[in-house]
């Protein structure tokens, strides 16, 4: 299965280690995985994937806001209606983590994506274990 892993860190920086671990877990199950950085790339390639996994961090500790790059990349990826997807949120703080995950799923569903799996990622090893469960 062709899977796109969209990396949406809270601030513009390189792809975090937990996103690479998630992709590594998916690849170990035989999937073809591409990591897309939401801060530097556009979403024009997204409709070509069978499954889309969004890995995000909350932009603020209070209120669970999502980074500005998330709605931008999802809006550019036209043709996402009905696309199966997963929402992964990196736990950065014990406060408002559920609200941040709900905001992530709301942004994805706004573009018509079907979120059939959501999870809070605790670290790189946890992300790799989650990646092995996709498509199983």
Residue spans for each PLM region:
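FMN-binding flavodoxin-like domain, especially the glycine-rich phosphate-binding loop
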Residues: 2-136
């Amino acid at each position: 299965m062709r899977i796109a892993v969209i990396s949406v860190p809270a601030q513009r920086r390189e792809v975090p280690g937990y996103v690479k671990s998630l992709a590594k877990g998916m690849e170990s199950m035989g999937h073809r995985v591409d990591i897309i950085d939401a801060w530097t790339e556009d979403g024009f390639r997204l409709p070509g994937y069978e499954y889309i996994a969004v890995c995000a961090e909350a932009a603020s500790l209070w209120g669970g806001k999502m980074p500005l790059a998330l709605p931008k990349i999802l809006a550019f990826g036209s043709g996402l209606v009905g696309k199966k997807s997963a929402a992964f949120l990196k736990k950065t703080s014990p406060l408002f983590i559920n609200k941040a995950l709900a905001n992530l799923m709301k942004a994805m569903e706004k573009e018509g994506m079907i979120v059939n799996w959501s999870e809070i990622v605790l670290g790189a090893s946890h992300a790799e274990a989650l990646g092995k469960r996709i498509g199983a």
